[in-house]
Amino acid sequence: DEQASAYKLTPLGRQLSQLPVDPRLARMVLEAQKHGCVREAMIITSALSIQDPRERPMDKQQASDEKHRRFHDKESDFLAFVNLWNYLGEQQKALSSNAFRRLCRTDYLNYLRVREWQDIYTQLRQVVKELGIPVNSEPAEYREIHIALLTGLLSHIGMKDADKQEYTGARNARFSIFPGSGLFKKPPKWVMVAELVETSRLWGRIAARIDPEWVEPVAQHLIKRTYSEPHWERAQGAVMATEKVTVYGLPIVAARKVNYSQIDPALCRELFIRHALVEGDWQTRHAFFRENLKLR
């Protein structure tokens, strides 16, 4: 019946529902197949599904920070999970299970959460295999990994204020990068964060540098385009305008020159007649145009 068909899952929805993580995280894994980074996406999304396995006891903050700093990536906290995962895999192969538990304790890692992380990864890996999604064996590029993650974090992007260590996020939210982040000391111009946590202020946790150019292709359903200064350009032989592209109010493209004919054909026709035909401001080989100029 009609109601049942309204609730039918799309092919993407059907795949999302099979992955054992939140749909937002599942979306990242599915996007990752286009970017050759399924392995990294599974490691990161399974880590984001659980409480952070890295512990930071109140009385051992400095010691635990030093242990965890080994895994930091100066541009991405998401890649710190990949570094940690690779380290744990190597250690687990080399050590007995008791020695591995002890290692987790001395590295300020919660053993049970590490196991939970590995379990979710294994489940993800199984479903991905059943869906026929190939898993990369070579490490993926930074850009590819973060574009895949971006599909699930579009409402968590931010642009740095020029003179402050603060970011403007979606719908004008203001947040700062969490002090535990590898990006805290040198915050980049644009970031995405895994979550926004409100304590004394709004903090962005698990952050990474992004290029605003990556946002537009994966955010088509959220994009707003505005146009200004439509004007005739002799060299282009067309009406051009300045396009601004925003997502949740953030200017991912501040000013791009575009052909205006598809946007407002009536105005373009009017400007063409006035500038090209009446004023003769046109570079063309059309015979009628040369004849027109002779009549002036």
Spans of features found by a protein language model:
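Extended alpha-helical interaction scaffolds
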Residues: 81-99, 103-107, 113, 121, ...
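Second RecA-like catalytic domain
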Residues: 1-236, 296
